[in-house]
Amino acid sequence: MPRGLELLIAQTILQGFDAQYGRFLEVTSGAQQRFEQADWHAVQQAMKSRIHLYDHHVGLVVEQLRCITDGKSTDADFLLRVKEHYTRLLPDYPRFEIAESFFNSVYCRLFDHRSLTPERLFIFSSQPERRFRTIPRPLAKDFFPDHGWEPLLMRILSDLPLRLPWQNKSRDIRYIIAHLTETLGEDALPRCHVQVANELFYRNKAAWLVGKLTTPDGTLPFLLPIHRTDEGELFVDTCLTTTAEASIVFGFARSYFMVYAPLPAALVEWLREILPGKTTAELYMAIGCQKHAKTESYREYLCYLAESDEKFIEAPGIRGMVMLVFTLPGFDRVFKIIKDKFAPQKEMSAAHVRACYQLVKEHDRVGRMADTQEFENFVLDKRQIDPALMALLRQEVPEKITDLGEHIVIRHLYIERRMVPLNIWLEQVEGQQLRDAIEEYGNAIRQLAAANIFPGDMLFKNFGVTRHGRVVFYDYDEICYMTEVNFRDIPPARYPEDELASEPWYSVSPGDVFPEEFRHWLCADPRIGPLFEEMHADLFRADYWRALQTRIKEGHVEDVYAYRRRQRFSVRYGAISSTANSS
């Protein structure tokens, strides 16, 4: 193979990444127009399209390499030299960290996820000392209350690129000042100032102004979700100023933001101050760089593993019928493998389960479905596997593992945020915490349904509780679109004996769901039943579900808020007209 071809291959890969990220920015830049035109279906389509861009461009590069090298690109030693040339191209490259992940993806596609070693891949960055380049233009702008907070906020809102009129800008400014005064105190407010990101963060039906509020006691988030009325007028729905609130807004159960970020590493570093609890992987995930987030997540896992003497164990909770789930006791993630054989009542294939997980990846998760990262040929050191888990792996997933002596290779798995299973949480809490959990569970079901998602299996064990007390769905093997379900009322019994029979007295077809039956397994606990009947009795009525289906089929897209209804300005301070119903 002629010398110089390695450099050509390296340049081809980098050019392929340039093309991918250019398209990524192109799709992202359309977010403002989609918001202004209230084209919510285009918002959903753009989200799916942007996710697919990465794999599409990896495939294009792989085909180019096979043509250029006449198939010899599968020679590992040759690609080692390609990596050396690629590394030399990165010091002057502005998105070097994601370009490294793109190289990894091309390599994995060529080698079918085999021979994944540090010398062949960018397992860790080639430039760890360089998180981001000198920024050619500021990411954010500072605003000081030299003449008071009212003119300061007027400048901020007036500087926004949105081309729609405001419903009542002065009113929104009064509400923001009222919130800041309540939060910080009237004396402290004049000594504070704000730094606001130049780009808006778009997601669902909102445009988020993201900023930092510098106070005498430190820096706080400053988040303003901007919505539009049905008449096309802008309004600020609330103001969020705590790290806990910001963490939920940027949470792992939400869709990725559309934010124009030609230098994503710089934006990640800027966000870190107001999201101190978020890892680098989570921040990249939040801004839509999900493939690089996977790289960062794997690095975080390796760093944890290197400093821990823990053993992998089966995850706490009721053992699943489809997935084998394990974890490290102190690690905040779980590892999920599709079993070789499912329980008899699970009439589905492994391909169906993978399709369900992909559906969740591409769909609006509305803060109620955990994001996952998919890995192939995942290597574990046997010495770090608890014997009980090792036995379980050999029993449940022998076709998914390869024994290499000191290591095993898991052919395919998902990594997901670890949560407390809701059924365990409900056993441990009482009083207001119990009430909050049941309210959260019902709200999760409602918000999923409004987003055209039916969980299928609604048992408490299939949901988890986050560190912020939010209830999130994480078992996807029976998930489907709401519009695919036939919600039915149970027909009246023909005879008294019918209700005692082991078989139903009515016909049941595939896709039939009888919401009345939910009551039997959601309200069996006497502590939970009355709370559920009080807050969520409508979930047991087929007409409730059919009404939601009608709204979905008519094209209605519900508002989903990343904060409590009571935090909305319309609830706290007064009505705002022409808004959709709160979730």
Curated annotation (Swiss-Prot):
Pfam families in the cross-refs: AceK_kinase, AceK_regulatory
Keywords of the record: ATP-binding, Cytoplasm, Glyoxylate bypass, Hydrolase, Kinase, Nucleotide-binding, Protein phosphatase, Serine/threonine-protein kinase, Transferase, Tricarboxylic acid cycle
InterPro entries reported in the protein's UniProt record: AceK_kinase, AceK_regulatory, Isocitrate_DH_AceK
EC identifiers of the protein: 2.7.11.5, 3.1.3.-
Gene Ontology terms: cellular component: cytoplasm
Molecular function via GO: [isocitrate dehydrogenase (NADP+)] kinase activity; AMP binding; ATP binding; phosphoprotein phosphatase activity; protein serine/threonine kinase activity
Source organism superkingdom: Bacteria
Amino-acid positions noted as binding ATP in the UniProt annotation, renumbered to this chain: 315-321, 336
GO biological process: glucose metabolic process; glyoxylate cycle; tricarboxylic acid cycle
Active-site residues (renumbered): 371
Similarity section: Belongs to the AceK family.
Name of the protein in question: Isocitrate dehydrogenase kinase/phosphatase
